[in-house]
């Protein structure tokens, strides 16, 4: 009976439960339900039935043996199968029981219980056909070594089915259950190593709580660890430390050896920072390390709360300008201090941008409604959150430079074309599809032995040796060679007392601070540049400066007090062959003989003197870069791995969630740029007005420039870099008034365009011929030629029809319903505004765009926009020097790929008259621009241009100049009208957009669009002064300009000039069109202005004729932008991991019932 519910039972079950109103209470009966959906099938709703009852179940045997039902579609949940009756022989059971012996084993008179597990034979009786498939799937997964499992196969559930069917006493059942439990257990850490809350999110000043369950492991103030247990009995009388230095360590006037690989002093300055980061022996107790055992950039941030507080401003997360916490570094060569100041500036850059971006509201400023202690506490938290996250980010750059730039030089990877690097943070395990690797984030404790391993004084250059000698003379009043160990500590203590407690008041290198607390950039750049040019010393015996004698003798004494193992014991611990002869230690006869006289037997050689006196390795490409002594080259790599892999802030907690997406990307390395090297980020961010974006001094400072030139020439990369010493680059001259802008842009003989450099870099000779590349007659002729092809008869109607049709097509195809299906949503920038111009340029210029209608294209819509936006940015908007090099190198690669494809297409069209080109499908008959691209190419050819010139001097640069700019103005105008300042104009725009297109309505819509652009646009243009001049601004200010100055004309203030725009904050769609300056004026005014205005008119019409256009709720509806000086903005990328010069994403919605 369709639609009826039928209950069926067979009376009382064997338990004799009572029946009320025909329904048994708690009886084991079968209840069957019939629904039309299930036809003649029945579903078992209760668990058990009489053995004689037969029934079917839905979904109890699917193709993989699972019991499933789709409860979302009206089906009832599945149930299990009816168990098979167990056949037993009562007489056999009775006989077994009667023959049992009396239970005498236990005192309580019970029989012992014996658990006897069944074997495979019994298991096979319970296995079904699909269980065999499950077993095979398990074996296959094991053999393939699958780490990530496809849970759509339901393998885990199928195993559960199999195990559930096996007998209770089955051995395989127990084994499979154990295996399942182990896998589930191992999916999580035990105990967990990562916890929530600021106390676990930020580094503590002293390094404690790096390991949550051993919080003092590696904290400042901890004891040194011991790496190797000393077992060899040392001689009763050891040689005098001073004699050891004179015999095998000290440098003589004729024995100095410069570094064989021409490594610069910068590498050793970096090593100095690392060494002082993790080692600070307490002079009152040499067993105690006053530093933490982590590379937490303590020389900058300090090892205690007091030290950290001394460098903070306690405002907006910033540090005091140009300072660092650790006084010890002030006594080092001044280049070390310059590196720390560069990190100081980077920290403040990070703190500023974290606040501006404010990812996820993480750094919201406290409410003005708070008062008293609550207000004070809120601002304190705001400052501390910014400071601590900025520290994590800055330390991230520190460790990336260490693991990529520094380590690549250590093992000579900088001389080969490889992206491999020894990054101890490399993840391993199931989630990355590899075997499990070494543990991460387990903490660290540095040892006394490694304190001795990191004393690389042989590598001090001649220049820095003189500095050390002068420092000793200044501190002790006598030459370093005359200073005794007992005087050493007293002298350093006195120096520390004389050093200002406030890091912001300290000086170094004879440099002076300015009124703003900063050092002069010219001084710092000169200092660090000279260090880049300074070849360091070589590792090995008899190369330590004489000025370091007292330091080295104290090191030998300290090693003896620590009772560290000898050189051979140390080597054996690291599985290195012990030395059997002194000639094995060093083949130099003089050094070997001195060691023999000092120690008698190689086993007696002490660790520290042995490490210094060992023979140094010769450079190997790759493999040996800094050419250390043999033992050092092995053990420092082990220590580097432990230092980094044990630090949770560089492993398990080094994530975008902790550093923010932007912070993580800001310091991340890209193996496709400089093979991952990121030192340039620190240099150029600290000194943007001195280091060019491609300065070899900034990119590869750990090798001297002359050697870098040899390396880069051999790798075929020398053309990417500038090898000149850095020098001051004057900042741009800013012109902000309407009249000043007109004057600069119209006076071509005095102010020249600056775009030739970017165009030439991207497109070579072809780019230099582009109409915007210069001010010569050639460029003016190129402009006329392109204008003649763009603006042919009927172009207005064709452009208008195209944008009207394409805008509607994209709004329909890219939008979607969410929620109650009454509102359509779309990303108006990413999926519509940017794309419509991509389609226009592709049709007009024959670009290889891949679409559903044109599947033979090469680049998708988003890829094409990305390429064209990168081209525009490189040529016209390359404003951030620290981001310029990766931008330019990556853009050139994709730009040339595009240009070569375009050139091939141009050749085909010009060679075969009837060809539509390589990338164009058959056009629709009503397609407005169906033959525009082909006609343009042939027209340019008719003007005498070569196929190369058409592609490289016209098509590609024109497309790059047009698409992102036009997309930008639409996005900014729409954003304005969706903002509180402009949203009350939307009803007026909507009414105009609903009316038929006429000259009047078109002009009115264009007026609204132009007003939105005027009020929200961020436009400007660069020129270079050819002569000295004085520019008179509208407010009477006179701006002096020197020949060679870069002049930036800002349209932001000019667009609000009340002289030209009365009531400038009010939208007036009827203002004279010629007043709008953002398309430029003069000889280089935007050639596509007329087409652009037709385009934005139709785009406004198409969008705003929709009802109730508005932002979607939440941050997806906002155009995320970050303010820059002069009223400009940059925009967050979609993942908020970086900044972009053009709007990226903003979602809107409208009513569509």
From Swiss-Prot:
Residues 732-1153 are annotated as: Epoxy alcohol synthase. Heme b binds at residues 276, 457. Induction: Expression is regulated by the MAP kinase PMK1, which is a key regulator of the infectious process. It catalyses: (9Z)-octadecenoate + O2 = (8R)-hydroperoxy-(9Z)-octadecenoate; (9Z)-octadecenoate + O2 = 10-hydroperoxy-(8E)-octadecenoate; (9Z,12Z)-octadecadienoate + O2 = (8E,10R,12Z)-10-hydroperoxyoctadeca-8,12-dienoate; (9Z,12Z,15Z)-octadecatrienoate + O2 = (10R)-hydroperoxy-(8E,12Z,15Z)-octadecatrienoate. Residues 57-74 have a biased composition (Polar residues). Keywords: Dioxygenase, Heme, Iron, Metal-binding, Oxidoreductase, Peroxidase. Its cofactor is heme b; heme. Residues 177-525 are annotated as: Fatty acid alpha-dioxygenase. Heme binds at residue 1086. Residues 46-56 have a biased composition (Low complexity). Its EC number is 1.13.11.-, 1.13.11.62, 1.-.-.-. The active site is at 454. Gene3D superfamilies: Cytochrome P450 (1.10.630.10), Haem peroxidase domain superfamily, animal type (1.10.640.10). One of its GO terms (molecular function) is oxidoreductase activity, acting on paired donors, with incorporation or reduction of molecular oxygen. Bifunctional dioxygenase (DOX)-epoxy alcohol synthase (EAS) that converts linoleic acid (18:2n-6) sequentially to 10(R)-hydroperoxy-8(E),12(Z)-octadecadienoic acid (10R-HPODE) and 10R-HPODE further to 12 S(13R)-epoxy-10(R)-hydroxy-8(E)-octadecenoic acid as the end product. The epoxy alcohol is formed from 10R-HPODE, likely by heterolytic cleavage of the dioxygen bond and subsequent intramolecular epoxidation of the 12(Z) double bond. Homotetramer. This is Bifunctional dioxygenase (DOX)-epoxy alcohol synthase (EAS). It comes from Pyricularia oryzae (strain 70-15 / ATCC MYA-4617 / FGSC 8958).
